[in-house]
Structure formats: structure tokens, C-alpha cells
Amino acid sequence: MVNAILDGRRMTTRAAAHDELTHALALPAHYGRNLDALWDALGEVEGRVTLTHTDALLEALGAYGAELIKTLYDAARDNPGLEFGVADETQAD
């Protein structure tokens, strides 16, 4: 079971975003490092995932960042063992 905090400030490129996801969620070595692969991997994750500094993520990645966040929300909706939320940036540090 994970209790992961994803830091949007570290997600400055697509590669950096997938590095953060891989590390924080202990994703398997075969994780494909794209949003479809993230969706598949999140089906196996149980626990709580919190994203901080969404503003930095969205500034750096734009539409891809928004799709990443949507993927996390959608996966949590479909996986009863996964909770996803966004932290108030004033309380994240």
C-alpha cells in the first residue's frame, strides 16, 4: 500500500513527470512512461496519492499536465483501492 506525495515542481518535462510517478508509486520496471501505461499501472496501486504544486505542473506541461491529473482522478474513480487528491499548496511544504 502506498502513501505517495507527487511534487508538481519536479514534473518539469514529460520524462521528469514519469520519473516522479515511477519513484513515488514504485511502478514496475516495465512501466511504459506514458499516460496509457500510467492508467494501466494505477489499476494495480492501492493507497493514497496526493499531488502538490499543481500550478507548477500545469505551467510546465500544459495540456499534458492536465491529462496526467485527469488520468490520476479517473484511475482513482475506477480502482476502489486507490485514493487521489490535490493538496492545498499553502499546506504542502
Role assignments for model-derived ranges:
Residues 1-93:
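Positively charged, polar, low-complexity stretches
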